[in-house]
Amino acid sequence: MPRAEEETENMTVKKITPVLFVEDVEPCVKFWMDRLGFEKTVEVPEGNKLGFAILQKGNVELMYQSYVSADKDSAATSQAAGKGPTLLYVEVENLNEIIRAIKGAEVVAPVRETFYGTREISVKDPGGHIVTFAQFVGAQH
């Protein structure tokens, strides 16, 4: 049986982007743009609201889609949108800068040092998803 790396050596994965499903896309876009400097690169209206948006900063990208938009998209998308909140784990260079930027956000896990060498904080975004910001303080992984 061929090894997986031989079978996939010509298969290039360009990126993986999470899609977060929410009731209201606008406050989530505002959170990432106003607090963390992301840029909205794509927006798709859904009636008089935003149904979908892509946010980007450098080579980091995430997408938000409203439940209403997901229901109209496809059966698979609609089904995925019905599952609880997602946790995003975001590695950063300077956690103190992030803490200043997210001041006022709902903290779900205060700053802590982990056994795996990070200093991290977890907050809830306006859509209810958990975002953990982590800075490696020991040897890099």
Spans of model-derived segments:
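Short glycine-/small-residue motifs
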Residues: 130-133
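Conserved active-site tyrosine of GNAT-family acetyltransferases
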Residues: 28-33, 102, 125-128
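Short acidic-aromatic low-complexity motifs
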Residues: 22-26
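Vicinal oxygen chelate
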Residues: 2-19, 39-91, 97-124, 135-141
